[in-house]
Amino acid sequence: MATIFSRIVAGEIPCYKVAEDDKFFAFLDINPMVKGHTLVIPKQEVDYIFDLSDNDLAAMQVFAKKVALAIGKAFPCKKVGQAVLGLEVPHAHIHLIPMQSEADMLFSNPKLKLSPDEFTEIASKISAAM
């Protein structure tokens, strides 16, 4: 059974795609902490990020860096934070979150409720900054 993220990559479940290459995929978190909150995943279905090969883990970080730099251009912030939790979906993923303060990285914070138009606009802004 494919994970929800594999189904997103396959186009079976819609998403707000930000970036993609042959190995990795970036899309907006549908329960964002702040505008611009993006997930980066390997297309390869791996549950635990540290089960990726060293080369794939390094390549995922380089891909995430490109996305993070674009997020920072699209949503001016002090830094783009990175978090890896990995308990909520059994598919390795990196959260990229534009931060004004460390409080923006608290996953216990209430999530934003955005409209489809807002999500589309956010994804477009980040993609355009790539």
Where are the language model's segments positioned?
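HIT superfamily nucleotide-processing domains
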Residues: M1-M130
